[in-house]
Amino acid sequence: MDTVLDPFTGLDSFSSSYFDDDDFFTDHSSRDHLDTDDFLDEDVDFLTNQIQEYYKDSRISQDGDYCDVGNFSFSSSSSTFSYGCADSTSELSPHRDGGLLKRRRRMRSEVEMQQLRQAANVRERRRMQSINDAFEGLRSHIPTLPYEKRLSKVDTLRLAIGYINFLAELVQSDMPIRNPHSDALNQPKKVIICHRGTRSPSPNDPDYGLPPLAGHSLSWTDEKQLKDQNIIRTAKVWTPEDPRKLHLKSSINNIENEPPFNFIS
């Protein structure tokens, strides 16, 4: 053994136990495992500092809060890191997948909450304004009686439904007249006459020198002849209900208007 180590100078400083002839070529696999805590102290301290710096930067950029170095600890027997922030503690395993920390929901400040409330109030006011404008347009298209105050939304919808039903009845009653399969011979014929007028030959006329005009003439009847023949015309007239009287009725389920009656003129 001494002959082998002769070329290597400076080995005298090592303990003789390292070069024991009995132990130098002995298989140490059968020996008990050595305690690794002494060998891992420096690595653990390095990793702890790196993890602390990482979470310190992350907390400052997000929440402005971070964990202290003293909250980190290492245990060689369990091979786990533990840390604690504020009042909470959790365990981090090297074999666990996913992030090391759950992102905490950022708490909104009082200024942000006030801005959100103001924005919600503005949206609600705009929504109510659009609804009121729509009801005003509906009131302007419905024939109503001269009321002392403006109609409510419920009364406006009730009158609108009745007026729509009345118009639907008028359309249905007018369908036979507009039916193309009806007898066309019984319909009064309209005479259309096409003529071409001539311009005045007088130079003093404003139309002098212009080309002749083309026009049409339609047949027409005199309204006075109808009166002389005692002809009576009838028409359907829709009378809106008075909302003030609806509250006096026992049943308010029927929101349609009463059937229209014939108006004799």
Swiss-Prot record:
Tell me which Gene Ontology terms the entry assigns under biological process: amacrine cell differentiation; animal organ morphogenesis; cell differentiation; developmental process; exocrine pancreas development; generation of neurons; hindbrain development; neuron development
InterPro entries per the UniProt record, alphabetical: bHLH_dom (IPR011598), E-box_TF_Regulators (IPR050283), HLH_DNA-bd_sf (IPR036638)
> One GO MF term, please?
sequence-specific DNA binding
Subcellular localization, per the record? Answer: Nucleus
Q: Which residues form a coiled coil?
A: none
Per UniProt, which keywords does this protein have? DNA-binding, Nucleus, Transcription, Transcription regulation
Q: Where is the bHLH domain?
A: 115-167
Q: What are its GO cellular component terms?
A: cytoplasm; nucleus; transcription regulator complex
Role this protein plays:
Transcription factor implicated in the cell fate determination in various organs. Binds to the E-box consensus sequence 5'-CANNTG-3'. Required for exocrine pancreatic development. Plays a central role in directing the differentiation of retinal progenitors towards horizontal and amacrine fates.
Protein known as: Pancreas transcription factor 1 subunit alpha
Chain's gene name = ptf1a
